[in-house]
Amino acid sequence: MCPGNWLWASMTFMARFSRSSSRSPVRTRGNLEEMPTVQHPFLNVFELERLLYTGKTACNHADEVWPGLYLGDQDMANNRRELRRLGITHVLNASHSRWRGTPEAYEGLGIRYLGVEAHDSPAFDMSIHFQTAADFIHRALSQPGGKILVHCAVGVSRSATLVLAYLMLYHHLTLVEAIKKVKDHRGIIPNRGFLRQLLALDRRLRQGLEA
């Protein structure tokens, strides 16, 4: 299971969702689990939150959510033995700071590192990092034997948002498809601001395909 922060995050999410639901009724257009692959025209952040809270909610310190792509927490990023055992070649830290994460931490392991200074706040613009992070993940998985750990503190919001953006940008999944794919393997809860930014990316990508 995830560290104790996961329980706190789940409780926070449920409280936030309950309050928002009481204020703003959610428009429903059928079961989200049965939503077609084409982006649903009425999809909104509240419906995404409902989807995120269905299905798998448990997680380990790291879970393989796509071939060679592990989504995890800070504990896994600090565990050199586990990184070596999994064959991790790249690390993307979505909670990089002066006190958390440096390339030097992986000296001797041959691991390439990218740090993204992101705050888990709805007001933070994570979208400015979507392409850079997706490119780094793509390069990691394109090399022979490449495996990447994408992590933040708990591995459910910042890092999950970047993984979803990668699946949308490089594998042309809709946001709903990307969420379902990740949730097959790990529970995630991107904050509401990140969900809005992913929705904007989804609309832009869908419009590009239709042009």
Curated annotation (Swiss-Prot):
The active site is at C152. The keyword Hydrolase applies. SMART domains: DSPc. It is found in: Cytoplasm; Nucleus; Golgi apparatus. It holds the Pfam family DSPc. Keywords: Cytoplasm, Golgi apparatus, Hydrolase, Nucleus, Protein phosphatase. It is an enzyme of class 3 (hydrolase). One of its GO terms (cellular component) is Golgi apparatus. InterPro entries: Atypical_DUSP_subfamA (IPR020405), Dual-sp_phosphatase_cat-dom (IPR000340), Prot-tyrosine_phosphatase-like (IPR029021), Tyr_Pase_AS (IPR016130), Tyr_Pase_dom (IPR000387), TYR_PHOSPHATASE_DUAL_dom (IPR020422). One of its GO terms (biological process) is negative regulation of ERK1 and ERK2 cascade. One of its GO terms (molecular function) is protein tyrosine/serine/threonine phosphatase activity. CDD domains: DUSP26 (cd14578). Residues 60-207 form the Tyrosine-protein phosphatase domain. Its EC number is 3.1.3.16, 3.1.3.48. It catalyses: O-phospho-L-tyrosyl-[protein] + H2O = L-tyrosyl-[protein] + phosphate; O-phospho-L-seryl-[protein] + H2O = L-seryl-[protein] + phosphate; O-phospho-L-threonyl-[protein] + H2O = L-threonyl-[protein] + phosphate. Inactivates MAPK1 and MAPK3 which leads to dephosphorylation of heat shock factor protein 4 and a reduction in its DNA-binding activity. Belongs to the protein-tyrosine phosphatase family. Non-receptor class dual specificity subfamily. Interacts with HSF4. This is Dual specificity protein phosphatase 26. It comes from Pongo abelii.
